[in-house]
C-alpha cells in the first residue's frame, strides 16, 4: 500500500475554519486528520503540501518512520508550523493504519482504557461575550452581556448535561461584556499583574456562574497567557472560595510555573502550546503542573500518547487541547481512550449547527460524556459533500 494523493479541504467553522487533510492510497483506503490553521497558522496548508510531497509513494502504515524522517528533514526549524504539518500527515496515516488493521485507533495503541470519555464544555460564555451578534443571528443562542446572563449560562450548562465547564476572564459593565485577554498584546504590560477592579470583575463573573449552575458543577477557569505569574497568583487566591477544579495558566518558564503551582490554592493546568516530549520534560521535572494539556493535532496522537506516558512517570494526569472541529473531537477521544492517566476531555459545546454534519457518522454525546467510536480508524470520515455545502470563504 502506497500514498498516492494528499489534499486539504476547509469548512466553515463559524469564527474559524475547520481544516481537514485527506490522504489517499493506491489500495483504496483513505485517511483523514484535522488541523488548525485559522487563528495562528495561516500558512499551514502550504507547509503540509510541501512536506507531504516527501511521503508520496510511501507506506502510510509505517507512520512512525515517516514522522521521524520528516522531523529529521526540518531539524534546524523544529516545532511551529513544521511540527503541526508533520502531525497532520501522521494523524491521517494513523487513520489508514487502523483501517487497514480493521481496528479503532485506540486499539492500535493498546487501548481502550475507557469507552466513555468525561467531557467539559470549553470557553463556556467566552465566545458569546466576544461575538454576540454571530451567536444570536447565526447560532440562535443568547448573547452574554450581563452577570444575569452569566448566571443563566451556568444553569444552561447543567441543563445540557455537563458536569464540568470552563470559562475565561470576562468583565461585565453597563457597556456589556468584555473578554479579557491582556496577554495577547505586545510587551509585558504591568496591567497583566491585575488590579483590584479586574479581580473583582472576575470574582463576580465566577460567582454568577456558580449561582446559576449550583454546587455540583465543576468549574475550570482559563486565564491562558493573560497574566504575569503575580497576576495568576492573585486570581487563584481571589477565586479560592468558588472551589475551582483547576486554574489554567501558561508561562514560558518551568521554574516560574512550578512556583505558581505552589502558591495557588487549587490544581494548576497548563502546557497546551508545547511540542513533543522534549518540550514537556523540563516542566514535568520542575513539577510545574497538576494537569498537562496536550494538543493532538499539533503533536500527532502517537507523540501525544508518548507525552502522556512521560507525564504518568511524573504522576501527572493529561487532558487534550481540543477547541477544534468535528474530526478533532474523534482524535481527542481516541487519545483519551489510549492513556491511563486521563483527567478529562475538552469539547466546544457552542459551535456551528452543522459541525457533525461534516462527518459521515456523528459521535454520541450525552450526559457529560463522549462515547468512543467503534468503527475502524477514527470511527468516521469527513463528509466531503457537507464540506462543499459549508465552505470556508473568509480568507
PLM features: residue spans?
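Metal- or metallocofactor-binding catalytic centers and their adjacent structured scaffolds
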Residues: 24-101, 107
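Metal-dependent enolase-superfamily TIM-barrel catalytic cores that perform enediolate-based chemistry
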Residues: 116, 121-258
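Extended hydrophobic packing segments that form well-structured cores
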Residues: 377-395
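Conserved, mostly hydrophobic/aromatic
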Residues: 3, 28, 51, 89, ...
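Shared catalytic-loop signature of beta/alpha-barrel
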Residues: 51, 65, 237, 243, ...
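Structured beta-strand/loop patches that form or line metal/cofactor-binding pockets in enzymes
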Residues: 1-32, 36-37, 352-356
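Short amphipathic alpha-helices and their capping/turn segments at secondary-structure boundaries
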Residues: 97, 102-104, 150-161, 379
Amino acid at each position: 500500500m502506497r500514498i498516492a494523493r494528499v489534499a486539504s479541504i476547509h469548512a466553515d467553522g463559524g469564527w474559524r475554519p475547520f481544516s481537514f487533510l485527506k490522504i489517499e492510497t493506491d489500495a483504496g483506503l483513505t485517511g483523514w486528520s484535522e488541523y488548525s490553521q485559522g487563528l495562528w497558522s495561516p500558512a499551514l496548508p502550504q507547509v503540509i503540501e510541501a512536506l507531504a510531497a516527501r511521503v508520496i509513494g510511501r507506506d502510510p502504515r509505517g507512520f512512525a518512520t515517516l514522522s521521524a524522517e520528516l522531523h529529521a528533514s526540518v531539524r534546524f526549524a523544529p516545532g511551529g508550523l513544521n511540527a503541526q504539518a508533520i502531525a497532520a500527515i501522521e494523524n491521517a496515516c494513523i487513520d489508514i493504519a487502523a483501517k487497514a488493521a480493521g481496528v479503532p485507533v485506540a486499539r492500535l495503541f493498546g487501548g481502550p482504557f475507557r469507552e466513555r470519555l468525561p467531557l467539559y464544555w470549553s470557553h463556556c460564555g467566552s465566545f458569546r461575550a466576544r461575538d454576540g451578534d454571530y451567536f444570536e443571528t447565526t447560532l440562535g443562542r443568547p448573547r452574554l452581556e450581563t452577570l444575569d446572563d452569566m448566571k443563566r449560562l451556568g444553569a444552561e450548562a447543567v441543563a445540557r448535561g455537563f458536569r464540568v465547564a470552563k470559562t475565561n476572564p470576562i468583565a461585565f459593565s453597563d457597556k456589556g461584556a468584555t473578554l479579557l485577554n491582556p496577554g495577547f498584546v505586545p510587551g509585558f504590560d504591568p496591567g497583566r499583574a491585575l488590579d483590584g477592579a479586574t479581580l473583582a470583575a472576575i470574582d463576580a463573573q465566577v460567582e454568577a456562574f456558580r449561582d446559576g449552575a449550583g454546587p455540583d458543577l465543576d468549574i475550570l477557569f482559563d486565564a491562558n497567557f493573560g497574566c504575569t505569574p503575580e497576576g495568576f497568583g492573585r486570581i487563584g487566591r481571589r477565586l479560592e472560595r468558588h472551589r475551582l477544579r483547576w486554574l489554567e495558566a501558561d508561562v514560558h518558564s518551568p521554574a516560574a510555573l512550578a512556583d505558581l503551582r505552589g502558591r495557588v490554592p487549587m490544581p494548576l493546568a497548563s502546557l497546551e502550546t508545547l511540542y513533543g516530549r522534549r518540550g514537556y520534560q523540563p516542566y514535568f521535572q520542575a513539577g510545574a503542573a497538576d494537569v498537562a494539556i496536550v494538543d493532538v493535532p499539533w503533536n500527532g496522537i502517537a507523540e501525544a500518547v508518548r507525552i502522556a506516558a512521560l507525564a504518568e512517570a511524573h504522576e501527572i494526569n493529561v487532558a487534550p487541547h481540543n477547541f477544534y472541529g468535528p474530526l478533532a473531537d474523534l482524535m481527542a477521544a481516541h487519545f483519551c481512550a489510549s492513556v491511563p492517566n486521563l483527567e478529562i476531555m475538552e469539547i466546544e459545546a457552542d459551535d456551528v449547527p452543522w459541525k457533525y454534519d461534516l462527518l459521515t457518522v456523528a459521535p454520541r454525546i450525552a450526559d457529560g460524556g463522549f462515547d468512543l467510536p467503534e468503527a475502524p480508524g477514527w470511527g468516521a470520515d469527513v463528509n466531503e459533500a457537507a464540506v462543499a455545502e459549508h465552505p470556508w470563504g473568509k480568507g
